[in-house]
Design a protein with these regions (language model features):
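Detector for methionine-enriched segments
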Residues: 1-2, 62
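Intrinsically disordered, low-complexity regulatory segments enriched in Ser/Thr/Pro
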Residues: 31-70
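Mixed-charge, Lys/Arg-enriched low-complexity segments
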Residues: 57-104
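Amphipathic, interaction-prone secondary-structure segments
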Residues: 2-46
Length: 104
């Protein structure tokens, strides 16, 4: 059983024609995290057992939007994937404004 080390919640205001977003990060330690993204009446989740950097927020800032969309998308529908891509861009903009830096 994995022990939860920390849970962080980000309330991201509406920006770039995207409704407000709730980002829930559960950190299990040792580069292991789960992310839940909620926007409007939809939610997406993904678990990473090794995301190269300690803070998953920095991992979310890497130039890997297509990988994130594939990890989070519930369907292969073009409309959902495009919406999720814009949501991830909004999350990235917010995290950068909060002082998180892109992982090297």
């Amino acid at each position: 059983m994995m022990e939860i080390k920390e849970t962080r919640i980000y309330r991201i205001p509406s920006q770039n024609n995207i409704d407000p977003i709730d980002l829930f990060v559960t950190w299990y330690g040792e580069h292991r995290s789960q992310v839940v993204i909620r926007c409007w009446d939809k939610a997406w989740t993904a678990y990473w057992g090794g995301h190269w950097v300690e803070e998953v927020e920095r991992f979310l800032l890497m130039d890997n939007i297509e990988y994130l969309v594939t990890s989070l998308a519930r369907t292969r529908a073009h409309q959902e994937r495009n919406w999720l891509k814009n949501i991830i861009k909004s999350i990235q903009q917010y995290l950068k404004a909060q002082g998180f830096e892109v992982a090297a």
